[in-house]
């Protein structure tokens, strides 16, 4: 396994990314009808986190691939 010190923490590597991630989190929670807070279930929080990851991957794919659409095998 590679020795990657940043793999065990949630430290953001891009300055200013925290605000964008928080905005995305609340937008997605609103779309899903999830009220974020201490009383929110892990399943609801997980659905928001999973969607954030999905959208970030899509953004990265668009930037790296020049905006090409996804093809299926």
UniProtKB/Swiss-Prot annotation:
Statement: the UniProt record of this protein carries the keyword Disulfide bond: no
UniProt site positions, description: Cleavage: 27-28
Keyword terms, alphabetized: DNA-binding, Sporulation
InterPro entries hit by this protein: SASP_alpha/beta-type (IPR001448), SASP_alpha/beta-type_CS (IPR018126), SASP_DNA-binding (IPR050847), SASP_sf_alpha/beta (IPR038300)
GO MF, one example: double-stranded DNA binding
Gene Ontology biological-process entries: DNA topological change; sporulation resulting in formation of a cellular spore
Domain of life: Bacteria
Segment forming the signal sequence: none
Any single Pfam family the record assigns to this protein: SASP
Family of this protein: Belongs to the alpha/beta-type SASP family.
Other known facts: SASP are degraded in the first minutes of spore germination and provide amino acids for both new protein synthesis and metabolism.
Job description of the protein: SASP are bound to spore DNA. They are double-stranded DNA-binding proteins that cause DNA to change to an a-like conformation. They protect the DNA backbone from chemical and enzymatic cleavage and are thus involved in dormant spore's high resistance to UV light.
Protein name per UniProt: Small, acid-soluble spore protein C2
UniProt source species: Priestia megaterium
Gene (UniProt): SASP-C2
